[in-house]
Amino acid sequence: MKKVILAYSGGLDTSVILKWLSEKGFEVIAFVANLGQKEDFKAIECKALSTGASKVYVEDLRREFVTEFVFPALMGNALYEGRYLLGTALSRPLIAKKQVEIAEKENAAFVAHGATGKGNDQVRFELTYAALNPFLKVLSPWKDIEFLKLFKGRTDLLAYAKQKCILTRATIEKPYSEDENLMHISHEGGKLEDPLYIAGEDVFSWTNSPKNAPDEEVFLELHFRSGLPVKVVNLNDGSTKEDPLELFEYLNRIGSKYGVGRVDMVENRFIGIKSRGIYETPGATILWIAHRDLEGIAMDKEVMHLRDMLSVKFSELIYNGFWFSPEMDFLLSAFRKSQEGIEGKVNLIIYKGNVVPVSRFSPTSLYDQSLSSMDVDGGFDATDSKGFINIHALRLRAHNLVLRSRDPFGWRRGIIDAEIMGKGV
């Protein structure tokens, strides 16, 4: 019998896929990834077995997710399209990696997932399979003609589940879809597909509304070594966390309580479709802001600016599913080098949705207070600035001399179209 390793969540889609594959003659081994989502994993295991799985792997991947995926992404200041911290995108290559490992252990020739043909996840799963074991065959039912003839949408899935006695809590009227892991929870679909629709508090399941957050701020002290968070201290009550997983979970609790990390955005999917997503990413938001602030005092200017250019590509590669790729190896190596001197601590105020760095210290600080002072010379010869400016002005003077008769900057007088401005909205 042909073996297939199915990435199984226990939800409607993957339960139907499990049964469908089983009835097509596959021996289905279900793989359930514990990435920190609030689920009853024993119940999911029992459901997989009752639906037709021959075996179930339930793997606790929380620590690996934080240390091998989330922290490296934060080290590279990953932020897709300036807003999305990539919680879902970072989890998929880890799930797919474990699928490949189980397939090799079980001598399975196939791997399968339940991602749709419109989304990003199908790409993330399948690029990871290709990178780690190109000999595995991929079963993607939502791109299979036979499957698509049977299942046009949610109604057909529910009818099939009822017919096959598959237990499900799903209903036809599902307000939106969610993806949850230790890093974030996302909300998409349903009413949220209308960009004019204003999401109410019923959408958010992790974070308090900032207006309902505590009136007293909390002071945190975050410590970093080589760009990685190694300790958090709550200066209000003295509590401390140093274990990576415990540290991240603690920041999630603090951030959720204070309404940190909410993002409502329209993003560009890899396949070309625009999609609205609402994200709650409390702990990672706190870490991202603190890490960036410490870099300000401890990272060389040119290294920072070069890294910032690379961070845009880094974020795209994560989003598009290229975690296991030669270009990602290159970037991760470069970022690791850039973080060698990022050591020290940042003090933050967390208050009603805001994360505000208020002080920072680094033993490898490149900040010279005497040089920066407005009141003290500090060994800086101000007359040197004259030559510095003259050198940088050389090409601007040359540009003007060559193009003077053509009014080189005249076009800017119409850069703001008065007619458009006058029309309002």
Swiss-Prot record:
Primary location group: cytoplasm
Nucleotide-binding in keyword set: yes
Uppermost EC category: ligase
CDD domains noted in UniProt: ASS
Gene3D superfamilies: Argininosuccinate synthetase, chain A, domain 2, HUPs
Pathway(s) it belongs to: Amino-acid biosynthesis; L-arginine biosynthesis; L-arginine from L-ornithine and carbamoyl phosphate: step 2/3
InterPro entries: Arginosuc_syn_C, Arginosuc_syn_N, Arginosuc_synth, Arginosuc_synth_CS, Arginosuc_synth_type_1_subfam, AS_cat/multimer_dom_body, Rossmann-like_a/b/a_fold
Domain of life: Bacteria
TM region positions: none
Entry keyword set: Amino-acid biosynthesis, Arginine biosynthesis, ATP-binding, Cytoplasm, Ligase, Nucleotide-binding
Compartments in which it is found: Cytoplasm
Biological-process GO terms, alphabetical: argininosuccinate metabolic process; L-arginine biosynthetic process; urea cycle
EC number of this enzyme: 6.3.4.5
One example GO MF annotation: ATP binding
Binding site for ATP: A7, Y8, S9, G10, G11, L12, D13, T14, S15, A33, G114
Binding-site residues, L-aspartate: T116, N120, D121
Residues engaged in binding L-citrulline: Y84, N120, R124, S177, S186, E267, Y279
Any one Gene Ontology cellular component term annotated for this protein: cytoplasm
Reaction(s) this enzyme catalyzes, per UniProt: L-citrulline + L-aspartate + ATP = 2-(N(omega)-L-arginino)succinate + AMP + diphosphate + H(+)
NCBIfam families xref list: argG, PRK00509.1
Quaternary assembly: Homotetramer.
Name the record gives this protein: Argininosuccinate synthase
Native source species: Pseudothermotoga lettingae (strain ATCC BAA-301 / DSM 14385 / NBRC 107922 / TMO) (Thermotoga lettingae)
Organism ancestry: Bacteria, Thermotogati, Thermotogota, Thermotogae, Thermotogales
